[in-house]
Amino acid sequence: MRIIGVISDTHGLLRPEALAALEGSELILHAGDVGDVRILDALERIAPVHAVYGNTDWGEVRQRLPRTVEVDLGSVDGAAASGTPAGPIAHVHHGDRELDLDPAAAGIVLVVSGHTHRPLVEERGGVLYLNPGSAGPRRFTLPATVARVRVGDEGKLEAEIVALP
């Protein structure tokens, strides 16, 4: 079983509790509003990171990151493989309205987004939709959260939201 850490909306704040919750991940996905490239560097010390920029990311963060990314959850570093992927494919983008494809038709089994700060785990049409919530400054009386996705041997996905103290 493989563990994928998922984080979003750090807005320049990487809590020690978020790092602790992501420890043990073999791959980390960041769904935007990173706030500072040093956050990506800190996450890279845990596992390879695939991230997208969000609507509040500018400068070096926006230059360094794509708007969307597809990640092979079965490969060692998550790199999108040419040819047959090693495992299930995840599509990562920031805003929930940025999805411009039919995930099931594209062979995508996990869609990760951020932006709303509201955690969400929902399966629709064979696709798991995940918003890890916000790990950054608290807003809208919502808790600070991250998520973990377990990838089973058969490619089965199980997601959980982890509330940060």
Language model: regions and residue ranges:
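Active-site neighborhood of phospho(di)ester-bond hydrolases with catalytic His/Asp-centered motifs
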Residues: 6-8, 27-33, 50-55, 91-94, ...
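Short, flexible, glycine/charge-rich loop motifs used to bind or transfer phosphoryl groups or to couple energy/partner
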Residues: 15-20, 39-42, 80, 98-102, ...
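Helix-adjacent hinge/juxtasegments
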Residues: 48-98, 105
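N-terminal active-site segment of His-dependent metallophosphoesterases
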Residues: 1-49, 57-67, 86, 142-145
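Binuclear metal-dependent phosphoesterase catalytic core
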Residues: 70-84, 106-107, 123, 130-165
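Short, acidic/turn-prone active-site loops that include or flank metal/cofactor-
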Residues: 12, 33-35, 53-59, 76, ...
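Residue-level signature for short turns and capping positions that connect secondary-structure elements
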Residues: 11-12, 97-98, 135, 164
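Non-DNA-binding regulatory cores of transcription-related proteins
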Residues: 96-124
